[in-house]
Amino acid sequence: MIENQIINNAINFIFSHIDEDLNVETIAEFCGYSKFYLTRIFKAETGESIYSFIKRVKIEQSAWRVKIEQGRSISEIAEDYGYSASNYATLFKEHFEKSPAQFRKENSESAAAGFFTGRENTLETYEE
């Protein structure tokens, strides 16, 4: 069960420092274990390597920002997570099967529609 606590500590550290240049050594040092041990138990417990996990979390969190932060360029958001614009676009497309620009466009349209639909539904609920 101690391994679960180590993994939880590592994951919490990753989420808290996701916009930094993370590496296994830094995470292992924070957890108080060797990088070899941490790498082994992380993969065994999660089924994913630490680097794969970090990459996935960065792409998923940055996608939320691409959707919400309409006033910022996609390149700026990519840089926040340590990616060049072209590298970011490639990783983003691998993960979501669409470019960041397509994702932003589709999600901004659906978010606006959902917002108004949600408000209408809420008002109807309160009126009943």
PLM regions and their residue ranges:
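Short hydrophobic/aromatic patch on the recognition helix
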Residues: 38, 42, 87-88, 92
